[in-house]
Each structure stands twice: as C-alpha cells, then as structure tokens.
Amino acid sequence: MVSKDKSAKYGSKEGYDADVMIDSKAMLSKEDFVATGVLTYALGDIIEVELPEYDVFALGDKCKMTVYTKSGLFVMDTTVVAKERGSLIVLNPPENRRKFTEKREFPRVDVKNEGLLFGLQDKNKKLKHQFETPMRFSIKNLSINGLGFTINENVMLEKVIQKNSQLEVELILGFLVPCTMEIVRQEKTNDGYYYGASFISIPEEKTNALRGFILKNQIETYFVQKRENETKKALEKKSAANQ
C-alpha cells in the first residue's frame, strides 16, 4: 500500500521518475483472464509489458494494469495498441503520466515528412512576410509540442527567419495540419539551416490525428530498435561462444 507521503507526491512537479516502473512486475487483466509479466519500457503515451500470454490479448482490448514498483503500487485502465512476439504495447493514461517526471515532457520521433511555409512575422508582429509561392521544408523530428526541420541553402531565409520568428505552415503527414509555430533554435548545417520550433496553435480537430501519428511512429521506432538490439546481443553471444 502506498504511504500518504508518497501519495502526496503524485501529480506534483517533484513526482516519481518514470524509470521507477522499469523492470517492475506488471499484471494485466481483462474479463476473466489475468497475465503477469515485466514492464520493460515507459515513455510518453506508451508502456511495454513483456509476458508469455501476449497472444491472448488483441489490439484494442481494454485492460486493467497493476504495476508493483519499489515506490508503490500503480493501478490504471489502459488499452492494447500494439503487440509483438512476447510483448504488448499499452497506452500510458494521462492520470498515470501525471504521477511521474520524465526527461522529455513529450517524446520526439524521427520522421521523413515535409511541410509548406506560407509566411512569417517577428514576435511583436511588426514585420510580416508572405511568400508568393509556399516554401517546402523537410521535417526531421516531431513531438506534440514542436518539431525540428531543415530548409536547403537559402541566404534570404537566413536573414528573415530568426529566433522567436512566428511561422505560418502546413505539415504534410499523410493528412494536412495547418498551424503556427515559433522558432526556438537555429543553426547552420552543411546542407542549409536546421530550425527547432514549438507549436503556438493547431486546429483542435487536428490534435488527435497528430498525436496518433506520433504514437504510431514512436511504436514502430521502438520495435525496430528493440529488434536491432536483440540481433546485436545474439551475435555477440555467438561470437563469445566461438572464442
């Protein structure tokens, strides 16, 4: 049972580190079935649980999960959103996320998409510039609160786009997301310029689609990295055995 002192920390700025759940025993239950496994990953909206009975669960299943950590017991309602041999990916609900602090508030995923820049203005909205032809840029990474992007060599943009500039853009993610964002970082690269930006406004009806896009890419990236790590370990083990 969690003590009052620990409970008081839930949801506070000084909450538990999210890593406290890693390698903890986790119990997943649905209807009349209960399975026990190990929580192996937790970042942002997703949690991975490795368990032998993974195949009993289907995508979209509603479950109750109990996590037994050294800092206390955590119980949450969740949904299965992905599965691979030996493991399930379930949603980390907002009410559970608020109990923890994370190194990055919103997970950032690497992507290979594009966007269009229509216009920009300075933070005080005194200097405005609209492009006759929208300028295409390459999105390199994306999170629910911002993105990193590059624009090929363009001397004019170097002078116009500065830190705190506000941009009117449209993200092309398989669906269109019109939004405004503010430049928070700028650096010269070999191919042009890299910018980091935070979102100022996104249409409410596009927010869930954007979150779903990021979630899908986060899951896919995680599984790819996990397979690569498992292959690397297997090769190292084989190499050590042959020596």
Residue ranges of predicted features:
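Structured alpha-helical
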Residues: 1-243
